[in-house]
Amino acid sequence: FFNQPIFEKFLRSEAIKHNNIDIKLGYKLTNIDAQESINNLTLLNINNEENEYITSNYVLACDGANSFVRKALNIESFDYKCDQDWVVVDYQVDDKYKINTDRYQICDYKRPTTIVPITGQHVRWEFKVNPDDNLETLEDEKNIRKMMKPHLWRLNPEIPLHSGKLLRSSAYTFHGLLAKNFKFNNCFLLGDAAHQMPPFLGQGLCQGIKDSYNLCWKLSGVMNNIFNKEILNTYSLERKGIVDFVIKGAMKQGDIIGSQDWLTATLRDIYLNVASYIPKLLKPLKFQKPWKIKNGMIDNDLFPNDVNGVIIPHPSLDIKVDNKLFD
């Protein structure tokens, strides 16, 4: 796990080091005309409310769950209909307490809870919202600490209830959505603009990073006249299947954790208790890996085998004493 705000700050600090990157803050995209070979974009300067017009050969839309680009291009999304309301809390433990870094997903039908130590003393808590909760008061510090109380010992039994700092708390509706296509002409959707998933596998940002890894080396090859432009069509083909698999896995995990029906939760608990003695029973509940690319550049007909398209770790190689990544 990593701290997402720190990671995003690092990305921005690295981006400003490159002269070929123009970072425009305080602008809003208000129109996009995505033609077959050129894109015309209108940007609104928030400060002086003046428009700026730019053209580009390619657009990579990383504009989040409410993506303007996705809506403007009329790209529809498939809804997995798995919405759940949760309160997400960032909690900073006092430095004098050493915390247990194990992650917990607590199957308590009265209040399903997730505890994830991220980096340092930073801990992410997630509490499922009950039907009779008042959202206006649920996020109050008093109520947050009340929900933390039964599980705080898991971090360290010595941590007092009112110690530490609540950095933020916010109610979210967890969605499962997948754009029906990640590409329109020379525009591409990446990250939450292309897909949204419940957080139970910690894969939201990770899948966005995988989007960029899949697309950018291909785009670089096309722009440098190394690859035929047709290679860009493989981006959506390769990524959609894997993201669909991850979303379904996260939904399954969420159903296990988040059940608030007494009978269902009781049967689940009995099953898990029995499975603790018969580990094979846990296999259907585990996140199935490896992820496999079944479409796109992989020719499963020409090279039919079990490992074709399987994603492997990204090693580094010593090439003339220069440590470089495999690609």
Protein language model regions, located:
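A generic structural motif
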Residues: 42-46, 92
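A conserved short coil-to-beta-strand element within the FAD-binding core of flavoproteins
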Residues: 25-40
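Short beta-strand motif preference
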Residues: 41, 124-125, 189-190
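Helical element adjacent to the flavin cofactor pocket in flavoenzyme catalytic cores
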Residues: 2-24, 29
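Conserved mid-domain beta->alpha element of the FAD-binding
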Residues: 11, 61, 166-253, 320, ...
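Conserved FAD-binding catalytic core of PHBH/FMO-like flavoproteins
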Residues: 13, 38, 58-176
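Core beta-strand elements of the Rossmann-like FAD/NAD(P) dinucleotide-binding domain
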Residues: 48-58
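Helical substrate-recognition/capping region of FAD-dependent monooxygenase/halogenase enzymes
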Residues: 9, 13-18, 221-327
